[in-house]
């Protein structure tokens, strides 16, 4: 939803990475919800004008042609929980006519590194007042991330942003032939309790 749904009023971490997620029971519910939220906002300079009025109607019509998706088993596949692996293997088997399995592009291995630089640098900037005034009240992992963010050089950050832009540009062609990409978003189900949300 980056550039489509405004982040105004939401705690800012990174203007380059922050985006609002939309959830619903059905695809139609998500379309109706998103249609309402998609607006140009002068307070969020990343938002753009986007015609979403017919989103629900288009969604109800279904796909124009048989949907095709790409599935990547990334370098982190071996770290993923057995339960999650089984779930994805089942998905691939059930929808094998719609999902093609590919090796990830070589530059994918650098994404976590550059993402971390952008995220932590922006977070250090966004949370600097909290860090200065209430460091002892903040979580250990958050403090460590902010302190790493304070140490990256300007070149580190510029290189990371350039990598992100080039990656988007290189990968955009994929969506001319495929509806989307399927890949695990985390290593598994979040830990029980409120102490942790699991692996980032």
What are these regions (language model features)?
Residues 2-85:
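A short helix-breaking turn/cap at a secondary-structure junction
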Residues 42-48, 97-106:
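Flexible, glycine/charged-enriched surface loops at secondary-structure junctions
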Residues 47, 115, 158-159, 188-200:
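Short, surface-exposed loop/helix-turn segments at secondary-structure junctions
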Residues 54-56, 80-104, 127-133, 157, ...:
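Acyltransferase
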Residues 63-72, 114-172:
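Short helix-loop capping/hinge segments that flank enzyme active sites or metal/cofactor-binding pockets
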Residues 82-84, 111-121, 192-198:
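Short glycine/threonine-rich loop-to-helix capping motif typified by GTGT followed
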């Amino acid at each position: 939803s980056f550039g489509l749904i405004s982040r105004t009023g939401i705690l800012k971490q990174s203007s380059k990475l922050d985006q609002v997620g939309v959830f619903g029971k059905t695809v139609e519910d998500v379309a109706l919800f998103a249609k309402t939220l998609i607006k140009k906002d002068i307070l969020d300079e990343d938002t753009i004008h986007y015609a979403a009025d017919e989103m629900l109607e288009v969604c109800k019509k279904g796909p124009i042609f048989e949907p095709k998706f790409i599935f990547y088993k990334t370098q982190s596949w071996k770290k993923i929980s057995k339960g999650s692996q089984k779930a994805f293997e089942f998905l691939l088997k059930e929808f094998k006519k719609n999902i093609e399995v590919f090796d990830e592009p070589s530059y994918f291995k650098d994404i976590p590194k550059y993402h971390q630089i952008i995220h932590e640098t922006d977070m250090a900037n966004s949370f600097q007042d909290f860090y200065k005034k209430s460091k002892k009240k903040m979580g250990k992992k958050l403090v460590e991330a902010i302190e790493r963010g304070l140490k990256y050089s300007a070149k580190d950050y510029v290189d990371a942003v350039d990598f992100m832009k080039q990656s988007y540009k290189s990968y955009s062609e994929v969506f001319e032939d495929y509806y989307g990409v399927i890949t695990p978003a985390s290593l598994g189900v979040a830990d029980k309790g409120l102490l942790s949300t699991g692996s980032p």
